[in-house]
Amino acid sequence: MKVVIVTSVASLLDASIQFQKTACRHHCNYLSMQVVKEIEEFGTINEKKLEFDTWKDVIQNDEIDAIVFYRVKQISISTGVLYESMMRNRTKPISMYFVRDCLAFDGNPPSFRMTSCNINAYNRNKIKDLIILMNMKTCNKKIIGEFIIDNFGSVDALLSIINSNVTWVTSVINNSNGRGINIRVSNNKMLTITSFRRFVNKLKMYKTTKCASQLDNLCTKMNKMGILDKK
């Protein structure tokens, strides 16, 4: 199956694009899909954007079997409307996958169905590594901050994943702190809440320190392009 990956960001300060690509590539590899093209969009996808040459090349190519999005929210119109717009210029049906949402839009007639959330397997390994790093006294904030950006794209993206897997994350945190399974049931809920809140608060600190660095990098890039040059 030949597919096209579509990633998108809402602002220049959104650093999640690389994480989106990694997640989509991992999903494609898991399902034995062949990635033939990757599209980076700014803003949401609508019917107007389908008129651009980049999209026309994809839509009119019947060798493309599917489009892999990171999530449904990348599309500002209904998925059904987007599908109908694409099919006006195709003779062969096309499927759509949404990695983060674990959804696929396909079939005859096309409809949503759940898919294997293999992205969680990738995220879990990275989150386990992150927790280990945060418990190591030899790891400073710079190392941990770079690990978050390299593997998740941004602190916001990481927090979104963590908030979707609260139970699993807290169990890993408790185990990494050396807490065994003999904890009294009456104390378990309080330990879970405390551990999770402490972990999230630590991550939010990396968000504030990283924002300044990202802004500096953005300004540097804009200077190189001449955007900030005085006329």
Curated annotation (Swiss-Prot):
Pfam family, one: Pox_F16
Keywords: Early protein, Host nucleus
Listed name of the protein: Protein OPG061
Family from the record: Belongs to the orthopoxvirus OPG058 family.
InterPro entries the record matches: Poxvirus_F16
Source species, domain of life: Viruses
Induction: Expressed in the early phase of the viral replicative cycle.
Main location: host cell
Compartments, as annotated in UniProt: Host nucleus, Host nucleolus
GO cellular component: host cell nucleolus
